[in-house]
Amino acid sequence: DRSVSRGLGDVYKRQVQMGTNGPCYVERPAGYAHTAMNWPVEPESLNWGPRYIQERYGLPMFIAENGLSCTDKIYRDGKVHDVERIDFLARYLEKLSEGIQAGADVRGYFHWSLLDNYEWHSGYRERFGLVYVDYASGRRIPKDSAFWYGEVAATNGGSI
């Protein structure tokens, strides 16, 4: 709790239950939405998580490193069409807006990463960025999500 109260904690929604030997993981049903890294897609966590932090600690907060990995690629038109990322962000930001309207003092939101980068867990395999990086050449291509997110930022969420 102390690290959370200092703004250093992560809030994740995990499904656990009490077993005879203590907490145990609950398998999600087949078809449960997940990212390319097999992390659950649970937009509601950006509604209840900030509200919980607000109710418990009464502190302003920033949301950092929210995003997902996708199997991004350059299409024949030379662009990166990452509709999964746009859908993910729209769902999460809608829920964050609900949390703010319910009283969470969220001062800012930061997408996981501007650029595709080296992920400590999986190297260059996962792509989290709003901008595609061709690691061989260093070339950068803004993904569709970069343009979408730019519009969201310019309208303070009004375009979601």
Region spans (language model):
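Single conserved hydrophobic/aromatic residue that forms the stacking wall/gate
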Residues: 1-12
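A solvent-exposed, charged loop/short amphipathic helix patch at secondary-structure junctions
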Residues: 14-36
